[in-house]
Regions:
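N-terminal segments that cap or nucleate solenoid repeat domains
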Residues: 1-32, 95, 99
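Short, surface-exposed interaction patches in beta-rich subdomains
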Residues: 4-9, 39-54, 58-78, 85, ...
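A common structural microfeature
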Residues: 15-17, 26, 35-37, 48-50, ...
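Hydrophobic beta-strand segments within beta-rich accessory/binding domains
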Residues: 18-20, 28-29, 94-96, 104-105, ...
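Extended intrinsically disordered, low-complexity coil regions enriched in Ser, Thr, Gly, Ala
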Residues: 31-38, 107-108
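Right-handed parallel beta-helix
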Residues: 95-134
């Protein structure tokens, strides 16, 4: 019932791909230095899910011998845990695939070219506390009944963002510095979605609802069927375009 160290060196590829495919667990991750691509610790109190690390020229996969995608065990000390740090030496693509897990990631300053997240249930928190030094082609998050909290999304430096999910709560904060034009698409079912945008960011939000509701706070002006911040009305700076398809839930728009 001990800890297993994790050490993954940078592969030969210029833009490598890191895939994390794990069962129900708790995972925290943050930025590190330049020495290693991935470093950290894996803790399995059951000794029943041995760690597997597959390293190839194009990237690496962190997974388990027999991943369990059920609920995170609530018993004291019963949940497997990952504590990871990502290097900042070279840009890379990141894929996360998991079941009913609790994820808490701060990827501020980590050079990411692409992120794909597929999670069944649980909780997923992602923060970009510092700007991404690389241009991110796509940020994609797909969930089942997972509660999602994404912070400082402008710092992710994405060109396109796609978020889809079922019955859960979504809090999306587009804080940070918007370095270029970006588009975000949100598609949810029976979900409460809160979208927050800095008042200084040029943002255009198009809401699409079936039986859902839209609550628009101060700082937005309706124009041509969309909700625009003052910088967007004035044509100042890069523009963040958000399409929010909230079919049966509620959408709240706020400026910060």
């Amino acid at each position: 019932m001990g800890d297993t160290p994790i050490h993954v060196a940078y592969p030969a590829a210029e833009d490598p791909h890191l895939r994390i495919a794990v069962g129900a667990c708790r995972l925290t991750a943050g930025p590190a230095g330049d020495a290693e691509w991935v470093a950290g610790t894996y803790h399995d109190p059951t000794d029943g899910r041995p760690l597997r690390i597959l390293e190839e020229e194009t990237g690496a996969t962190i997974t388990e011998e027999q991943p369990s995608f059920g609920r995170v065990r609530a018993a004291l000390g019963g949940a497997t845990r990952y504590e990871l740090e990502f290097g900042k030496k070279r840009p890379f693509a990141l894929t996360i695939e998991t079941g009913a897990s609790d994820f808490d990631l701060d990827l501020g300053g980590v050079p990411l070219s692409r992120i794909a997240v597929r999670q069944g249930a649980g909780k997923f928190e992602l923060d970009f506390s510092q700007p991404n030094p690389a241009r991110m082609e796509l940020l994609e998050v797909s969930t089942g009944a997972a509660a999602i909290e994404l912070e400082n999304l402008a710092n992710a430096n994405f060109s396109e963002m796609r978020l889809s999910g079922g019955a859960a709560g979504y809090e999306l904060d587009f804080g940070g510095t918007l370095a270029h034009d970006a588009e975000a698409s949100i598609e949810t079912g029976v979900t409460a979605v809160t979208v927050s945008v800095p008042a200084s960011t040029a943002a255009r939000v198009a809401a699409e609802t079936t039986l859902g509701s839209v609550d628009v706070g101060d700082g937005f002006t309706t124009k041509e069927g969309a909700f625009l911040t003052e910088p967007a009305l004035s044509g100042v700076g890069p523009v963040l375009k958000i399409r929010a398809g909230v079919r049966l839930g509620s959408l709240q728009l706020r400026t910060t």
